[in-house]
């Protein structure tokens, strides 16, 4: 039985990889605007996102960026969601959420922000390894139990096709996020790894939805 599992492929740098992720069944694709080997310009992201189906959640990743710049970049790149991957305060997160439809707050496993993740009030919370954000590091998954009760928890940090089954079964997240774990080189995805990652994440998920949402979610809904 294939379970309900939100899957995001992050660190997209080119149209081929975005279309590959969508064809393989990803729910979301992510673009990095923070310093990284996978960093992309807003115009580049726009050229890719305008070719994607409306039901795909398109996400921009930022780290400790000014809320106004986050919002401006999201709009120029034609994205639907902002992922705040730094030490943003709840007030900064709220500023972004006023003008961006979906917001994901990333927290570090074992940190105070993770234990109090509900205070950010975001649509989704992503838990990453220390030094995460494409670093390919795995964290002690038992730390996920310390995270405040949030409606949609996305597990990241060193996930690969080889460990995603174990990760999903142990943590029972609402979704999973991968970047370097499905690459053949920095910024270039490996089609076989992408396919196996998505397939195994869904096979490991419980057949019933986790959390308050029915799956799949309609990311094309702009009524807010």
Model-derived regions, located:
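Conserved N-terminal beta1-alpha1 strand-loop-helix module at the mouth
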Residues: 1-224
């Amino acid at each position: 039985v294939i379970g309900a599992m939100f899957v995001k492929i992050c660190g997209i740098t080119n149209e081929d990889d975005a279309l590959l992720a969508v064809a393989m069944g990803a729910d979301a694709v992510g673009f990095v605007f923070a310093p990284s080997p996978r960093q992309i310009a807003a115009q580049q992201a726009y050229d890719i996102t305008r070719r994607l189906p409306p039901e795909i959640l398109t996400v921009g990743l930022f780290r400790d960026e000014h809320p106004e710049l986050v919002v401006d970049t999201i709009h120029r790149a034609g994205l639907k969601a902002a992922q705040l991957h730094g030490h943003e305060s709840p007030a900064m997160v709220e500023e972004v959420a006023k003008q961006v439809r979906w917001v994901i707050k990333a927290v570090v496993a074992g940190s105070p922000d993770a234990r109090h993740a509900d205070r950010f009030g975001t649509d989704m919370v992503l838990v990453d390894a220390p030094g995460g954000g494409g670093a390919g590091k795995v964290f002690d998954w038992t730390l996920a139990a310390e995270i405040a009760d949030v409606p949609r928890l996305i597990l990241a940090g060193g996930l690969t096709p080889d460990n995603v089954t174990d990760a999903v079964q142990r943590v029972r997240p609402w979704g999973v996020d991968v970047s370097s774990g499905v690459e053949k080189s920095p910024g270039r995805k490996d089609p076989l790894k992408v396919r196996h990652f998505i397939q195994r994440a869904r096979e490991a998920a419980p057949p019933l939805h986790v959390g308050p949402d029915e799956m799949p979610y309609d990311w094309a809904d702009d009524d807010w």
